Amino acid sequence: MGKEEKVIRPIVHFSPSVWADQFHIFRDEQAEQANVEQVVNEMRKDVRKDIMSSLDVQAEHTNLLKLIDAIQRLGIAYHFEEEIEQALKHIYDTYGDDWKGRSPSLWFRILRQQGYYVSCDILKNYKEEDGSFKESLANNVEGLLELYEATYLGVQGEDILDDALVFTRTCLEKIAKDLVHSNPTLSTHIQEALKQPLHKRLTRLEALCYIPMYEQLASHNESLLKLAKLDFNLLQSLHRKELSEVSRWWKGLDVPNNLPYARDRMVECYFWALGVYFEPKYSRARIFLAKVISLATVLDDTYDAYGIYEELKIFTEAIQGWSITCMHTLPEYMKLLYEGVLNIYKEMEEIIGSEGKAHHLSYAKESMKEFIRSYMMEAKWANEGYVPTAEEHMAVAFVSSGYSMLATTCFVGMGDIVTDEAFEWSLTKPPIIKASCAIARLMDDIHSQKDEKERIHVASSVESYMKQYDVTEEHVHKVFHQKIEDAWKDITRESLVCKDIPMPLMMRVINLARVMDVLYTHKDGFTNVGEELQDHIKSLLVHPIPI
């Protein structure tokens, strides 16, 4: 006992959860929801007709793209996946790279989002012969916004998109400033776009933002608007129900009392999983992922902010063994955590076992084992006071970011679309997953470095880079921000060229990167939960949209 009292732990005092037991109880209103679902189903039929009726009329193809854009931004595209794919395939087959309609930027963005590798050459139409952008575009807000959003679907080497981003951002910043008083609604719309482009937004947050904006458009479709509102609230009810289930599971672990050194961020972890997929058909996958992220957060704090080196070695070995028989070797406080990890994987194994997919958990377990090994390597470096080179650091840190583990884990429970080959692909860390890991690692390190320097902790990628290249922290941040933008371009490229993996699986990896952009663009909004994230959670999970 005396020996235990002498142990010096690198403990950190994280702020408690801001939610308490707010989401513990869920009131199910099935009868009322059934009526709403019936209305939604009828309205969906009309939208399907609207999409399909324009296919054979070339003069309507620009309007068709605008309709698809509205459907996507309103958050209801998941109802019309087949119709949208059929429409965009028809447009691609009809025009190839030679789009004849209006709004070429919109055409470019919508098709690239869908996985069609259309050429950016059409955007040269926005330029004069001397290479400058046309003056007429500088005051065309709609055209500027369309081009601005299109630039984020670029890949490495597409200089015209890089030039267009600089041009449109400069013009839009000026317009937003000029319109603050004369047209505050449009000014706010522009500022929201500049703050976070569509390509980096989570679908549910974009729906939340776009629904009131769409309602103010004189050209809005009243039926489409009502469908978006009703559907938003139906999904909110489902997500509340799921969060209630995860909340009760978390309450059973009682992390705040049993593992008080760890961040109590279960609600934020569910928000994270919700960002990866919001659709009803992925409900069980979402619940599992939320639990994994919640425990991964505790694992992170165990290795970073509490566990001593010898304890961490034992825990790492126990995870590699993955058996309840390993539990007796662990310190008392680690037993609850270890059992919690094993239990959620076993539970999911049983859930999907009836479909003959229990073996999918073996891939998820392997990714978790690798994740823990990366933590152990960082603990070893911290214990030895070793500052790795930038290259050494990133090789390990890409895994310790958790995103390669989550990219594999999030496939579990998604249904028949996930094959053994898809899991094997994810474990090879293909370019799109590497890019997502890069975004996660670099954004996290930029904002968490100062907090972590105050305790015994492995040197961050920022510190490794500063030491190796003898540069300032400010310089490293600039370099890392460019690397993050390059990683986004790599994600776009892979979504266009990788045809072996279904787009719904690619979207999970893209959405993981989008969550990072929401949580870490300005600060570590996950560890230090601020008003913005609280507002997001309240809007998505507490307050329904008025009909």
UniProtKB/Swiss-Prot annotation:
EC numbers: 4.2.3.57
Cofactor: Mg(2+); Mn(2+)
Binding positions (Mg(2+) 3): D444, S448, E452
Known pathway: Secondary metabolite biosynthesis; terpenoid biosynthesis
Record GO terms (molecular function): (-)-E-beta-caryophyllene synthase activity; magnesium ion binding
Assigned keywords, A-Z: Lyase, Magnesium, Manganese, Metal-binding
Enzyme class: lyase
Positions occupied by motif DDXXD motif: 300-304
Annotated catalysed reactions: (2E,6E)-farnesyl diphosphate = (-)-(E)-beta-caryophyllene + diphosphate
Tissue specificity: High expression in disk florets, moderate expression in ray florets and detected in leaves and stems, but not in roots.
Binding positions for Mg(2+) 2 per the UniProt entry: D300, D304
Residues binding Mg(2+) 1: D300, D304
Functional note: Sesquiterpene synthase involved in the biosynthesis of beta-caryophyllene as the major product and trace amounts of alpha-humulene. Produces exclusively the (-)-(E)-beta caryophyllene enantiomer.
Comment on protein domains: The Asp-Asp-Xaa-Xaa-Asp/Glu (DDXXD/E) motif is important for the catalytic activity, presumably through binding to Mg(2+).
Family indicated by similarity: Belongs to the terpene synthase family. Tpsa subfamily.
Listed name of the protein: (-)-beta-caryophyllene synthase
Species whose genome carries this gene: Matricaria chamomilla var. recutita
Taxonomy of the source species: Eukaryota, Viridiplantae, Streptophyta, Embryophyta, Tracheophyta
